[in-house]
């Protein structure tokens, strides 16, 4: 007779062996299913590539490619109303800005009539400025001619002496020295352009002296009043 402990031990062994065999079987089934799924995907992708290549060869993919720009065109037409409203708003804003600017220019011209003179007046002013410039240039040129004539008169004696022995080039050096000495002796105060500045400076000096005299007289008067009060 077998003991119950031996029976239980045999049952446990059989159960463990059955569990192992079931686990191995499930693992084998799962691996087989995974392999089949991967193979199916590969076959499906290969069939897709083949169909695409055949369609490319036959030219059946051209209408598919033309469908995309049609969609873009539809979307542009869909948003055209929004874009038109934006453009209209911008045009209105620009028109308002132009009107405000023109109104401000008119007001400025009314406030400052001198700045908004006619082109004829501006041309007359330009002509007067040109005439003053021409007068100043003529005055300066006449003054230069006078100085040159004076230099020629001053050097007539030396020129008469040096006309005969012109063959010797060294005789021209003293003439150059004399000319340079004469030009250096001319003071800048004789220039007509400086007369205005000199007169202006003299007027400023006289005004300052007058102010000093007035201040001194007032101080003396105050001092005399204080002395009389004491």
UniProtKB/Swiss-Prot annotation:
InterPro entries: DUF4718. It is found in: Membrane. Its main location: membrane. It holds the Pfam family DUF4718. The keyword Repeat does not apply. It is a single-pass membrane protein. It comes from the Eukaryota. One of its GO terms (cellular component) is membrane. Glycans are attached at residue 126. This is Uncharacterized protein C1orf185 homolog. It comes from Mus musculus.
